[in-house]
Amino acid sequence: QWFYKPGGGALFDLGCYNFTSLCGFLGPVKRVTALVGTAIKERIVDGEMTQVEVDDNAHVLLDFGNEVYGSVTTGFTIQKYGHAPAIELFGLSGSMNMLGDDWAPRGFERWRNEANCWELFEETDPNWPWADGLNHLIDCIHADTPTVTRPEHAYHVLEVMLAAQESSRLGRAVDIESDFPAPQYPVLAAADSRRLHDPS
């Protein structure tokens, strides 16, 4: 029942992964506007009727600055979702779709205007275990190197989620104060992909 008490809720249980990924791709958020609420006020948990005291439904708009925007929809109100991309990124010269979920990645698709087709990048480690982040942490401690996702990044995501709740309460945008150094990723070559037929 603690899941539906203060400290729990959809933003902190589910949304945290989406915010962490989007901030990893696009950098720190500057401002948040959100609608956050409780659609299902009571739930049966462990055979008992439980009052839901936290959010179970949220739509969050993120302003990354420089006219770069994102949105996250999350909630315990979504019964099942299809095989649509988990994360979509749209830019001036193309688009990218993350396939699968953060915890079960299936690679990604990339559209580049110059290639004029979708390119599929298969998951590089399809047997990647969910707990492998712990191995990464241990490797970084042994090598005295920083982790890919830094503590500042996690703190920033926490501030974004709290700001989403505040924005919904106040009915206005909320500025974000924290910052973090954006992660650096290797550049992928088209040779690492295979082309897909685009029926459109």
Regions inferred by a protein language model and the residue ranges of each:
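NAD(P)-dinucleotide binding in Rossmann-like oxidoreductases
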Residues: 43, 50-57, 65-133, 150, ...
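A general structural signal for well-ordered alpha-helical segments in protein cores
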Residues: 18-19, 105, 131-135, 161
